[in-house]
Amino acid sequence: MVSIRPDEISSIIRQQIEQYEQSIKVDNVGTVLQVGDGIARVYGLDKVMASELVEFEDGTVGIALNLEEDNVGVVLMGDGLSIEEGSTVRATGKIASIPVGEAAIGRVVDALMRPIDGKGEIHTTQSRLIESPAPGIVQRKSVCEPLQTGITAIDAMIPIGRGQRELIIGDRQTGKTAVAIDTILNQKGQDVICVYVAIGQKASSVAQVVNVLRERGALDYTIVIAANASDPAALQYLAPYTGATVAEYFMYQGKHTLVVYDDLSKQAQAYRQMSLLLRRPPGREAYPGDVFYLHSRLLERAAKLNDALGGGSMTALPVVETQAGDVSAYIPTNVISITDGQIFLSSDLFNAGLRPAINAGISVSRVGSAAQIKAMKQVAGKLKLELAQFDELQAFAQFASDLDKATQNQLARGQRLREILKQPQYSPIPVEYQVATIYAGTNGYLDDIPVEAVAKFVAGLRDYLRTNKPEYGEIIRTTQKLDEKAEALLKEAIAEYKATFTA
């Protein structure tokens, strides 16, 4: 018979007791009552927070948006095809956050910063909440530095400053995205990090934009965030906030950033879809009551920070699409009232061949000349006045048959000024050469050049200045003023080039 040794048994029991660890994991779980149209109704989840992330059995993630007495309304960030009635849902205890860092530059990602360009994972160590409060009044500084778009009409008449929010508004196919992309291309070498957010667009359109940025070397300082038309409404709703969060990370490091939201009409439509499916009461144009707050909390995050916080900035260019030029619709009026100005693109001007089709009469920048270099201020004031007078005279000239010489001269100059504001797509012009062309136009140097030859003349003049008078560009780049020496060089160049052009 085997002898039982009590000391051995007691040591084994003691060892077992010492190694025993009791860990209780408590999960806040619920049950799916119904699911469909990107919305799930969940029973349970008693301790869930507003906007908390929840996880379904199949791994689909959702956001708890409606916290009601007897159930929770969750919007799905996936197709949710394998979610069934009765399946369990787990609250994660986290609010939506995304990874941020330098590694994201040059990549194409979705609204949750997951790469969609096939170049592998993005390795970052930091993360930020998608929804974070905007900088307060004390943390801000007034907008004082220009953000050059490279588009003469904008930089001269509707200047944009670093930290400003400037709306780009117009009908479909009027060149809104082209203005935004040109602005991104013009930031090359300016130490500005750009974020392009595509909301509800065709995947082919986004691919085209990415190709343009890659071919022109702009992807080296740009992050593209895409929530395509085929993506769930929740991702289209989140994408702009993701863009703001990425830009905010760089802004708080003292860097300058530019964010393009293309376009906020689609985000509002995605939010409307979610709200109606969650049975929230509809308001004007069936949008929910908080659609103003949807955009204001996004655009208020754009700022120019004070020097104590590093002096970084985030400039926002939201895009809004109008229907038949109606800027008094709900979303356009909301965004106009939130932003610091708007660039209005007109389909009539676009069809008449004036591209970019900027309607200078309705467009405005509420920051104004604080966002211009001194050289541009010196020449732009006269341009605005002459174009305004030209628009009035043109309307009057349609009815009058015999016009006096002064009026004819003014109309002729106005036509030439219109020509110098025309610009091909994807070819931004440096500010020093914009100053030169406006100076030539407003001081009558183009009055004897045929209207159809003006575009060729100003393009040639820019090349002539670049090769024969490099000192002119150097003076404006360093002093930012059109001083006597620069003006003398410019006059010389115009006279010399004109002689060869008309010969």
Curated annotation (Swiss-Prot):
Its main location: membrane. It is an enzyme of class 7 (translocase). Transmembrane segments: none annotated. It catalyses: ATP + H2O + 4 H(+)(in) = ADP + phosphate + 5 H(+)(out). InterPro entries: ATP_synth_asu-like_sf, ATP_synth_asu_C, ATP_synth_asu_C_sf, ATP_synth_F1_a_nt-bd_dom, ATP_synth_F1_asu, ATPase_a/bsu_AS, ATPase_F1/V1/A1_a/bsu_N, ATPase_F1/V1/A1_a/bsu_N_sf. Inhibited by dicyclohexylcarbodiimide. The keyword Ion transport applies. ATP binds at residues 170-177. It is found in: Cellular thylakoid membrane. GO terms for cellular component: plasma membrane-derived thylakoid membrane; proton-transporting ATP synthase complex. One of its GO terms (molecular function) is proton-transporting ATP synthase activity, rotational mechanism. Optimum temperature is 55 degrees Celsius, activity was detected from 4 to 95 degrees Celsius. The record marks 363 as: Required for activity. Its EC number is 7.1.2.2. Coiled coil: none annotated. CDD domains: ATP-synt_F1_alpha_C, ATP-synt_F1_alpha_N, F1-ATPase_alpha_CD. It holds the Pfam family ATP-synt_ab. F-type ATPases have 2 components, CF(1) - the catalytic core - and CF(0) - the membrane proton channel. CF(1) has five subunits: alpha(3), beta(3), gamma(1), delta(1), epsilon(1). CF(0) has four main subunits: a(1), b(1), b'(1) and c(9-12). PANTHER family: ATP SYNTHASE SUBUNIT ALPHA, MITOCHONDRIAL. Belongs to the ATPase alpha/beta chains family. Produces ATP from ADP in the presence of a proton gradient across the membrane. The alpha chain is a regulatory subunit. The complex from the organism is particularly stable to disruption and remains functional after 6 hrs at 55 degrees Celsius. This is ATP synthase subunit alpha. It comes from Thermosynechococcus vestitus (strain NIES-2133 / IAM M-273 / BP-1).
